[in-house]
Amino acid sequence: MIFLTLEHILTHISFSIVSIVITIYLMTLLVHETVGLYDSSEKGLIATFFCITGFLVIRWIYSGHFPLSDLYESLMFLSWSFSIIHMVPYFTNHKNLLSTITAPSAIFTQGFATSGLLTEMHRSTKLVPALQSQWLMMHVSMMILSYAALLCGSLLSIALLVITFRKNVENFGKSKSNPFLIGPFSFGEIKYVNEINNVLRNTFLISFRNFRRYQVIQQLDCWSCRVISLGFIFLTIGILSGAVWANEAWGSYWNWDPKETWAFITWTIFAIYLHTRTNKNLQGINSAIVASIGFLIIWICYFGVNLLGIGLHSYGSFTSN
């Protein structure tokens, strides 16, 4: 009973901290001179990491197995993975663009895990025979870590597309409304001095904003590639370890189970993404489009089988209890 109480306390503390972190992020968007608040939000997500770590350790102790046997535990582990990804740039003293992705992702996954939809899964149960293997920790942890990294990288790519599209729309609108920026100057009388000053000022502001957006786009592109590359490595390890485990449990390395099929599709999509990164003509928007497609594929792979409750991996589904 004490373990369940500790679980309950830790999950609610971590969820509350993440909620506060997101509130602080919103405040920093409104008020830029809040370095102290921003640093507090960074440390807040680190505190969330330790709370979820405590939850996983406690659940591991009293259940007797690694806490990745059902959807509830995997969602908590996914939230824990988002926290890890968040801490990497923080401790390497890089500008943490991931924080705008990891914090909302953590609160979304943890909020869904602790919601009433998964109440029956909150109490740990005995492992089904298929999961009673030392490969459980290796295979499932690698897959969840890959989902977290690939989701973060894909969201960064989606942000890149949004900023690029918005920039193009704004430039088109400004070119329509400001003839000084696209056509010959029509200066008549003595007002031409003021008109020239206005044109130069507008041109400078537009150039500065475009330069800042260019920098943000380049950073988003760089970080999305890094995070997706890491996630692709985890995904490859997870699929290979799962194949070995499947051979031990079911006598075959690959069965084209729905989960296996969508994992292969996910791997293929992000392999295409990494291939586009090797071609300079396909980098940027083209590779971001591929990553955006991958974002949808990951959710189908992660939740699709769980919603349907079919195939060899149905023990982690909503209908398994």
UniProtKB/Swiss-Prot annotation:
Claim: Membrane is one of the keywords in the record: yes
GO biological process: cytochrome complex assembly
Membrane topology: Multi-pass membrane protein
GO cellular component, one term: chloroplast thylakoid membrane
Chain ranges passing through the membrane: 9-29, 44-64, 71-91, 97-117, 143-163, 227-247, 261-275, 288-308
UniProt-listed InterPro entries: Cyt_c_assembly, Cyt_c_biogenesis_CcsA, Cyt_c_biogenesis_CcsA/CcmC
Protein's cellular compartments: Plastid, Chloroplast thylakoid membrane
Keywords carried by this UniProt record: Chloroplast, Cytochrome c-type biogenesis, Membrane, Plastid, Thylakoid, Transmembrane, Transmembrane helix
Coiled-coil spans in chain: none
Superkingdom field: Eukaryota
GO MF assignments: heme binding
Keyword Thylakoid: yes
Function: Required during biogenesis of c-type cytochromes (cytochrome c6 and cytochrome f) at the step of heme attachment.
Family, as annotated: Belongs to the CcmF/CycK/Ccl1/NrfE/CcsA family.
Record text on subunit structure and interactions: May interact with Ccs1.
Protein name: Cytochrome c biogenesis protein CcsA
Organism for this UniProt entry: Nandina domestica
Organism taxonomic ancestry: Eukaryota, Viridiplantae, Streptophyta, Embryophyta, Tracheophyta
Gene: ccsA
